[in-house]
A protein has these predicted regions:
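N-terminus-centered regions that define maturation/targeting leaders and the start
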Residues: 1-138
């Protein structure tokens, strides 16, 4: 896609625990609010994560996500992880990983659904969410 820096473009290992009552699935997103687009940049969107799954292994996006998980279109134009690569010399960019506890078994979306539409669906179906932020500059 013409985007890529260091690190081999591996999706990170992430784990979680303590889901709230009523969680029927999870969704995981990664968003860069500092991208010079005027609207940020979606790096990863994974939905319909079964509640029994509490970890994604290193490079799960490329190696094959566990059964049931759907990755949807990011701002790279396709589903799957796209690693950080801010413009050279730009200020450090924030990469916000958000885990949503979702009340539905599955969001009514498909692989080509935009991150904006997934975000809309999550806005109305998230029970609780938590976030982790990383910084990257080159």
């Amino acid at each position: 896609y013409g985007f890529g820096c260091a690190g081999g473009n591996l999706s990170p290992q992430l784990s979680w625990s303590g889901a709230p009552d009523g969680t029927n699935s999870f969704a995981l997103t990664c968003f860069d609010p500092d991208a010079p687009t005027g609207s940020g940049f979606w790096h990863w969107v994974a939905v319909n994560i079964p509640p029994s799954i509490t970890e994604l292994s290193l490079n799960a996006s490329a190696d094959g996500m566990p059964d049931g998980i759907l990755e949807t279109r990011t701002d790279f134009g396709a589903p799957g992880w796209g690693g950080p690569c801010p413009p050279e010399g730009d200020h450090p960019h924030r990469y916000v990983f958000t885990l949503h506890a979702v009340g539905l078994d599955a969001l009514p979306v498909e692989a080509d659904t935009s991150a904006a539409v997934v975000g809309f669906m999550l806005n109305f179906n998230t029970i609780e969410k938590t976030a982790l932020m990383g910084l990257y500059k080159r």
